[in-house]
C-alpha cells in the first residue's frame, strides 16, 4: 500500500481498495486473480447503473422506522472482516439517525460460502452464521435479531490471515442463550429448509441487484435524487479515491449503490445531502 495513491490489491476471491487514511474494501465472489495494477474505472454505462433491488418488505430485518425516507439495504457476510467494520459504521449511523425516524437499516444475507472454480471456499462458516441470524429473528423476533447481530459482529474475529477460521461456531448457541434464545430450537431451525431457503433468497436477490461481494449496500430514497447529492457523490469519488463502479446513482435516480466498507464521514455526508 502506498500513501497518496489509490491502490488495488487483488487476491483469490478478495479485493481491497485502499487510500491514504481510510480503507474502502469489499470481498468479492469468485473474483478472478488479476495483476496488481490499477484498473481504469472511469467509464460507466447505463447498463451497469441499472439496479434491480427487491423491495423492502415486512419479511426483511429492519432496524428503525420502516417508513423512513432513507433506507440503507446492506448485503452482508457474517465472516467478512470488512462487513464487521461497516457494521460498526452502520451502528453509529443508526445511533445518530435512527431516533429521528429518518434512516432505517435493512440487513440481508449474502454468505460467501460457495466454492469458486478451483474449489476454494472463502468463508465456509458464513452460511451457518447467516442461518443463525435468520433463526434468531424467527425465534425471538426483530428486536432479538438486532441484539444478537450487534453482539455477534462485535465479538467475531471474522476471517483474516491471522484468524482464517473466523468465529468458533460453538460460540453461536452460547451467544444466543445469553440473549434468551432456546438453543435446542435454534439448532433445529438452523438445520431447517426454511432457514436455508431464506438465506438463499436473500443471496439471489443480491445477485439480481448486481452484488458481487460484501459488504454491498443500497441507499433507497423516497424521492428522486437531486443534483446536490449527485455532486456530493462525484466529489466523494475524488476525495476518497473510490472507483466509479463502487459508488454510483442508479439510472432512475432513486437508488445509490455503495460497495465496500465506506467510511462513516462519507455515509453521513450522503445522508445529509439527501435530507436537505
Language model regions located:
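Extracytoplasmic/periplasmic mature domains of Sec-exported, cell-envelope-associated bacterial proteins
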Residues: 24, 49-53, 59, 124-128, ...
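Functionally engaged cysteine thiol sites
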Residues: 46, 116, 127, 135, ...
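C-terminal cap of thioredoxin/glutaredoxin-like
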Residues: 2-30, 75, 170-276
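Short beta-strand-to-loop junctions in surface cap/lid or active-site-entrance loops
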Residues: 60-68
Amino acid at each position: 500500500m502506498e500513501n497518496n495513491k489509490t491502490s488495488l490489491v487483488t487476491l483469490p476471491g478478495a479485493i481491497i481498495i485502499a487510500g491514504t487514511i481510510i480503507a474502502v474494501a469489499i470481498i468479492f465472489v469468485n473474483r478472478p486473480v488479476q495483476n496488481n495494477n490499477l484498473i481504469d474505472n472511469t467509464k460507466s454505462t447505463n447498463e451497469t447503473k441499472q439496479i434491480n433491488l427487491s423491495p423492502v418488505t415486512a419479511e426483511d430485518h429492519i432496524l428503525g422506522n420502516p417508513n423512513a425516507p432513507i433506507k440503507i439495504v446492506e448485503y452482508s457476510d457474517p465472516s467478512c472482516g470488512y462487513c464487521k467494520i461497516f457494521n460498526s459504521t452502520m451502528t453509529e449511523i443508526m445511533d445518530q439517525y435512527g431516533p429521528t425516524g429518518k434512516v432505517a437499516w435493512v440487513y440481508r444475507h449474502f454468505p460467501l460460502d460457495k466454492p469458486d472454480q478451483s474449489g476454494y471456499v472463502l468463508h465456509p462458516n458464513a452460511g451457518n452464521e447467516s442461518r443463525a441470524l435468520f433463526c434468531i429473528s424467527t425465534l425471538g423476533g426483530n428486536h432479538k435479531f438486532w441484539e444478537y447481530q450487534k453482539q455477534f459482529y462485535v465479538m467475531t474475529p471474522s476471517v483474516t490471515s491471522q484468524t482464517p477460521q473466523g468465529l468458533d461456531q460453538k460460540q453461536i448457541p452460547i451467544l444466543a442463550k445469553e440473549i434468551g434464545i432456546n438453543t435446542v430450537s435454534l439448532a433445529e431451525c438452523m438445520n431447517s429448509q426454511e432457514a436455508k431457503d431464506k438465506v438463499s433468497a436473500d443471496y439471489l436477490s443480491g445477485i439480481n441487484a448486481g452484488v458481487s461481494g460484501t459488504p454491498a449496500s443500497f441507499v433507497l430514497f423516497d424521492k428522486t435524487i437531486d443534483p446536490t447529492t449527485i455532486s456530493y457523490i462525484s466529489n466523494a469519488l475524488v476525495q476518497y479515491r473510490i472507483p466509479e463502479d463502487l459508488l454510483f446513482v442508479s439510472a432512475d435516480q432513486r437508488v445509490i449503490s455503495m460497495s465496500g466498507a465506506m467510511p462513516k464521514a462519507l455515509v453521513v455526508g450522503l445522508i445529509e445531502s439527501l435530507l436537505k
